[in-house]
Amino acid sequence: MRYSPLIDQLIESLRCLPGVGPRSAQRMAFHLLQRDRDGGRRLATAIREAMDQVGHCRQCRVLTEEPVCGLCASDRRDRSLLCVVEGPADVFALEQATDFRGLYFVLMGRLSPLDGVGPEALGLDRLEARLAEGEVQEVILATSPTVEGEATSHYIAELAHQRGVRTTRIAHGVPMGGELEYVDSGTLSHAFAGRRDYD
């Protein structure tokens, strides 16, 4: 059913969010219009301001309102450690879950030749230039354990090795609290092969 042009536009606009289909977008639109107009206005203002003011850090490419993010600007970070991630959300996840004190480089994706995503689309030339500066002593690869993520990690490892930079990969395996019988065979095989001494 078609509603008024403005309601249709709102519903269609909400569908740009990941995981939001037509029914969810319709429910959200009606909720904002019927029950939370102030919340809708705050949401609209927050979206507008974020879209206008948030960009990418010119050093690590994480989302920030400043030319250089707080992580890169901090003198408390270990500049010899560089963790390479696929997206800005990965930086926030690692910052919340780990005590990593190094810096980051955000790829904004992963290599995917079938989709036309090559090294230049990921800014790997910028990463290579950063490695050439000589400050980075270890690159920590924190890409997804997918075919594309592994290919991306392999490509970056080659760049790092050419510069004599140590390269490590985050461990993948059985999640905390997970039952072995429910873990897929690829994950289980990878976890078993990557076993370490028990202290």
Curated annotation (Swiss-Prot):
Pfam families: RecR_C, RecR_HhH, RecR_ZnF, Toprim_4. The keyword Metal-binding applies. A zinc finger (C4-type) spans 57-72. The lineage of its organism: Bacteria, Pseudomonadati, Pseudomonadota, Gammaproteobacteria, Chromatiales. The keyword Membrane does not apply. HAMAP family: RecR. This is Recombination protein RecR. It comes from Alkalilimnicola ehrlichii (strain ATCC BAA-1101 / DSM 17681 / MLHE-1). Keywords: DNA damage, DNA recombination, DNA repair, Metal-binding, Zinc, Zinc-finger. Residues 80-175 form the Toprim domain. Belongs to the RecR family. One of its GO terms (molecular function) is DNA binding. Coiled coil: none annotated. CDD domains: TOPRIM_recR. It comes from the Bacteria. May play a role in DNA repair. It seems to be involved in an RecBC-independent recombinational process of DNA repair. It may act with RecF and RecO. InterPro entries: DNA_Rcmb_RecR (IPR000093), Rcmb_RecR (IPR023627), Rcmb_RecR_Znf (IPR015967), TOPRIM_dom (IPR006171), TOPRIM_RecR (IPR034137). SUPFAM superfamilies: Recombination protein RecR. GO terms for biological process: DNA recombination; DNA repair.
